[in-house]
Amino acid sequence: MRTILLTIAYDGTDYYGWQIQPDLPTVQGEIEKALHRVTGKEIHINGTGRTDRGVHAYGQCATFRIGDGIPTDRIAYALNNSLPGGIRIVSAEEKPEGFHARFDAKGKTYRYRLLLCGPHEDADGAPQAQRQLLYLRNYVYQVNRPLDLAAMRKAAAAMEGTHDFACFQAAGGEERETTVRTVYRVELTERCLEEGFFPEEESAHVLDIDVTGDGFLYNMVRIMAGTLVDVGSGRIGAADVPAVIESADREKAGHTAPPQGLYLMRVYFEEDFGHGEE
Amino acid sequence: MRTILLTIAYDGTDYYGWQIQPDLPTVQGEIEKALHRVTGKEIHINGTGRTDRGVHAYGQCATFRIGDGIPTDRIAYALNNSLPGGIRIVSAEEKPEGFHARFDAKGKTYRYRLLLCGPHEDADGAPQAQRQLLYLRNYVYQVNRPLDLAAMRKAAAAMEGTHDFACFQAAGGEERETTVRTVYRVELTERCLEEGFFPEEESAHVLDIDVTGDGFLYNMVRIMAGTLVDVGSGRIGAADVPAVIESADREKAGHTAPPQGLYLMRVYFEEDFGHGEE
């Protein structure tokens, strides 16, 4: 038996999240169906992160075991021919026996993407911002208030490090042994989209919040992003963020930013840290 | 009674075209439902063009009649609050009694959008182009062959003017009195997307084919776009396009480009030609 690691990109708009569910389209379900069409076998895959409905990925990972048959270097091509256009296998590689996309993951990077729009009105008083989001509505969290980026960067720095992140955990996830996690980096990058694909991108500003950590609690990145937006709009003081974390109280943190702004960018394994021993 | 002209933008991905159909989501159906929610009345709207399933619009038009009640300058705002995010009312304006979005239209501009990608393979031999189209797959026609733009521009010029365009008409549309139409302009604009919203836009080339005419036969723009792609890839000679039109034979023209690359950009009425007499 070979152990195969898939790297997967997907547009989460049309899926009820990663995890397989009866009678609902999910990313895991579509990939297992495609594996069945390609190999004729029922193959179960283990994903690194169970992304929620509407959340996207550029670098989700999953492992499965497979016997003889399709060569490893044809798996991505064969699956892509069988998968819907919104799910793409970026690569498939063989790993040592027992390698597991979830248990062997050492960390992940998520991106949370904001679209910063001023509150505009057209001649009729109708908010122009509504039109702006026609084509990007499923891929970004639109914020119509001015945001104080310096305050957000200060708050982001306070979120880095090893903390009990219970304040950034939503109810409803799996039970965890501990709510202590290490956030290696929270990086804010703003850029202006000069001439994009859609007219709505013209003169829009994108603010990406890239969060890298060793693990994440349920909805943690979305609550971090919502908290940063609340800091940027003055609802929460940047200087208060350490106390919010200290409190371990979900009520003291900011709102949960919506799923469509979230992208699972990359999963890190032992060898990504440069001291693998395969 | 007031006569109201709506200008409408929509993402056609989730709709079975413009025209209302029982039990299927359509753009006209969603707008009539929203009008009912906003006014409490059953109001029928007349659209300018019956776009097909998957076709988009930035400037579709539609008219309807309405009595007292909601002020004209609040209609767009009220409808947008009631419509799904993929349909946006750009404007609502009062027109003279009897004005009709379809019968008073003097012309339209459609855009057909191609994404030009070289045939790339990654290290595993899997076509990279498949990944590139994850997020733009519903908004563009991806072409992986090199295209001869000079030949396409020559063919485009041959499509301009007043001709019997029966060769560019698909079966299945409404019956028309004549297949003679005037195409005022076919313009090709290529541009490179430097740093777009999605990574797949990086270094992609967009080729827009903008077609303005007094009227269009069923699938005419999609067949014109497919014919131009066939000219660009050498399947049809640019010098043969006048004879293709002359033949009035659908079999001699090129393939029908897929719906997701097509956008209804603008509808022209009498006053847009500068000699209105309202």
List each model region and its residues.
Chain A
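Structured-RNA-binding interfaces characteristic of tRNA pseudouridine synthases
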Residues: 1-278
